[in-house]
Regions:
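Flexible, acidic glycine-rich loops studded with aromatic residues
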Residues: 87-94, 100-179
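Active-site neighborhood of glycoside hydrolase catalytic domains
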Residues: 3-95, 99-114
Length: 179
């Protein structure tokens, strides 16, 4: 854990963190009965402290490569626009969940060969019992007015074969709220 950021953050500087995750992915992706049998594996990587951007980028690239060695298609949350740095992260052929334009430059990612799934928080996040996202999706508005190419503030991105579609996300940001 990275105590100054909360117990829910991995310490991206500790060798033990990498050893643990390597062992976990090895167990889940190999052997006679792997847990992850589908083609894709999501590595997470999102919403870390900006002061740690370079190490975050290193961690992200490390696990994109790690998952690829098992023949899996790695997925990740799009955070690299916000987590600026010099450490290269190769998104070519990787799938990013494009959840917020402030966190991911989607057009650039698509031009560089990333695949993307629109998971735009403004339209597609359900976070019950909070006042900053929806409790439910607006099905009628989505059916009548929305497009998978639509991001924040209704901005439409260019059509791309690497835009795979869209998905919604349900989060429980309030632990202990009975939901």
């Amino acid at each position: 854990d990275k105590k100054e950021y909360g117990m829910d953050h991995l310490d991206l500087y500790k060798k033990e963190v990498y050893d643990f995750l390597d062992t976990l992915f090895d167990e889940y992706l190999s052997g006679d009965h792997p847990v992850f049998v589908g083609p894709d594996v999501h590595i997470g990587t999102d919403e870390y402290n900006l002061k740690e951007a370079e190490q975050f980028r290193y961690f992200t690239e490390y696990y994109l490569k790690y998952i690829t060695k098992y023949g899996k298609n790695p997925r990740l949350w799009g955070s690299l626009k916000h987590m600026k740095g010099n450490t290269p992260v190769n998104l070519k052929g990787k799938t990013v969940n494009a959840w917020n334009y402030s966190w991911l430059d989607l057009e650039t990612a698509l031009q560089e060969g990333a695949k993307a799934i629109n998971t735009c928080d403004a339209f597609l996040y359900i976070v019950p019992a909070v006042n900053y996202y929806h409790n439910f999706l607006d099905h009628q508005w989505i059916y009548e007015s929305w497009s998978p190419r639509m991001m924040q503030e209704g901005e439409m991105i260019e059509q791309s074969t690497n835009l795979l579609g869209a998905m919604f996300a349900v989060w429980n940001d309030r632990v202990g709220n009975g939901i």
